[in-house]
Amino acid sequence: MTERRDNVSHAPDAIEGPNDGAHAEDTSPGFFSLENLGVAQVQVVGGTLNGYVIGYVAVYLLLYLTATECKFTTEGACGGRKIYGCKWSGTTCKFENPKCSEGSDPSDSCKNEVAYTSVYSGIFACAMIVGSMVGSIIAGKCITTFGLKKSFIIVSITCTIACVVVQVAIEYNNYYALCTGRVLIGLGVGILCSVFPMYVNENAHPKLCKMDGVLFQVFTTLGIMLAAMLGLILDKTGASKEEANMAGRLHVFSAVPLGLSVAMFLVGMFLRESTATFAQDDDGKADGGMDPNEYGWGQMLWPLFMGAVTAGTLQLTGINAVMNYAPKITENLGMDPSLGNFLVMAWNFVTSLVAIPLASRFTMRQMFITCSFVASCMCLFLCGIPVFPGVAGKEVKNGVATTGIALFIAAFEFGVGSCFFVLAQDLFPPSFRPKGGSFVVMMQFIFNILINLLYPITTEAISGGATGNQDKGQAVAFILFGLIGLICSVLQFFYLYPYDANQDHENDHGGEPVEQKTYPVEASPRN
């Protein structure tokens, strides 16, 4: 296994020509071959679950808002679910404990409780991410202790339990149980985000390794789009929202992750064992396995730092704010919330498909740095500055911001999101990847928490409260996203290089060290 990883090109600045490696092309499996699909299937199931869990927040908040508005026109829809604070009175659905008297002018001191407050929304959005952060911390130990295949089963069982807890929480409208379920499913997702990319990185054919690697993000965006599409269907079709059983719709919406968790269990049961194994004896040097203690944390400080920078690029440039609050953002731009959310997620998926052919031609480093720079510019110059009140008229602002969000998502999916999970592995030597990859994934979840918790609260505060001009807070947020992204892009241009096995090899034999800026591994098309 290690020999395959160390067999890299020695032409630092060259890309293989059409006649180079012809023999490898003749013997390598096709992208859609059964051999390759046997490896890539983990990306299909794991990525889709990861994406659906991410896209869950925006849709759930939208459906819950409808459930708590108490605008139902039938007794069954209103009185049947008193847990949402509604009661049927004569011929009208009313709030069970209204803060406002009939005919009063709703002011800041008179508002019936509808949906979640910005604080509760932020906590709900962060619950899964907190669990994911914990999961990513233990992912490395899980991999070295149980192996990759058994880790799949652990993830599936954890996610299944979490989905059951969420269903119970919906039935009784229990906010704390809902957040508990989200934390549990986040725990599974945190392990998943390290285990699945590592399995593909270690078991896919070298020619297809990076193309298979970006599939995790492709199917993550598919899962996000599926959540948005189902949300649109539940919000717009069938019985009208004024007559619908919204609790039932929330149950249906929350059942999809349960099915994906069961599918993941089946994949884990029948998946072939990974070629990557780790030593389990006290000395860490059992035959046939890599030593997980071969490198100490101190030896990997610089790759760990650059991993944290890539995680910052992934999360602090605004993608999660767009994903979780797409309905609100698109509503501020004059669109229907559920339709706007679906269009954003559909575009997110379509653009991610472009990463597959790009990965066969360009390196992960080239794609990541170029696209992070472009995405940051979109945040700053199209989504931020023009949206600030007074800079542009309403029609111009909406048009420019919509274009900016579309281009930002495209740039992000072309190279930032698609390459991140591959780089999280490639930055480190094979034996350190359980620790190093888990650390990088953990950092992106930490940044994710900051965005999910602070974005709604900060934008509302900057805008002057819930009744203020929300464009102001949104503009300031995207300006900051753009500036952070540009700083990270500069650091990555000078210092982001995947691990080079040849450097260790030459140092072990007394040769001259290979300079970090000329890593031969980066010249290979599979990187």
UniProtKB/Swiss-Prot annotation:
Keywords for the protein's UniProt record, in alphabetical order: Membrane, Sugar transport, Transmembrane, Transmembrane helix, Transport
GO CC terms: membrane
Membrane-related topology note: Multi-pass membrane protein
GO MF terms held by the record: hexose transmembrane transporter activity
Record bears the keyword Transcription regulation: no
Key word DNA damage present: no
Transmembrane segments: 44-64, 119-139, 152-172, 176-196, 214-234, 250-270, 300-320, 339-359, 373-393, 404-424, 437-457, 476-496
SUPFAM superfamilies: MFS general substrate transporter
Extent of Basic and acidic residues compositional bias: 506-515
UniProt subcellular location: Membrane
Renumbered residue ranges of the record's region Disordered: 1-22, 506-527
Main location: membrane
PROSITE patterns in the record: MFS (PS50850)
Function text: Facilitative glucose transporter.
PANTHER family recorded: FACILITATED GLUCOSE TRANSPORTER PROTEIN 1, SOLUTE CARRIER FAMILY 2
Family recorded in the similarity comment: Belongs to the major facilitator superfamily. Sugar transporter (TC 2.A.1.1) family.
NCBIfam families: SP
Record's protein name: Glucose transporter 1B/1C/1D/1F/2B
UniProt gene name: THT1B
